[in-house]
UniProtKB/Swiss-Prot annotation:
It comes from the Eukaryota. This is Allergen Cop c 5. GO terms for cellular component: membrane. The chain crosses the membrane at residues 118-140. Disulfide bonds: none annotated. Keywords: Allergen, Membrane, Transmembrane, Transmembrane helix. It is found in: Membrane. The keyword Transmembrane applies. It is a single-pass membrane protein.
Length: 141
């Protein structure tokens, strides 16, 4: 089972939209499908997979799609080093970024409660992207 969700945050008030999906594909196949959908939909829409627990033959992942301000690229952290809260704060202040095309889908990043704020003007277009993603993802599985 996989959980797909988009995390929006405007100022300090988060608006969360989650959709649970039952998936019968093994994780690598799902990663490839979702990676392709993200590239097609919106380069500002970034994908994160969080392993939650191991099931027989499958992994349960939380797919968290974080939407960022147009001038900020997403911040990735490798699975070997989970960031502390002070690391996250300094990373946000300095706007450290890395090109999403060179990053691995298995990278672990900040969770939805620590996502960066997004402007209201971008919110409506991002909701449309999420709905398109959900529809395409359901068709793919």
């Amino acid at each position: 089972m996989y959980v797909a969700g988009v995390s929006f945050q405007q100022d300090t008030m988060p608006v969360l939209v989650h959709r649970k999906l039952e998936v019968n594909h093994k994780p690598p196949a799902v990663k490839e499908i979702v990676k392709h959908l993200i590239q097609v939909l919106n380069p500002k829409l970034h994908l994160y997979l969080f392993p939650v627990r191991r099931n027989p033959g499958y992994l349960k992942f939380t797919i968290s799609l974080h939407l960022f301000l147009a001038h900020i690229n997403c911040i990735h952290y490798s699975t070997s080093k989970l960031p502390s809260s002070s690391t996250l704060s300094s990373a946000k202040r300095s706007s450290i970024s890395r090109n999403s095309s060179s990053s691995s889908l298995s990278d672990i990043t900040m969770n939805s409660s620590e996502s960066l704020p997004i402007t209201l003007s971008l919110l409506s277009s991002n909701i449309a992207c999420f709905l398109a993603f959900s529809f395409a993802f359901c068709l793919a599985v």
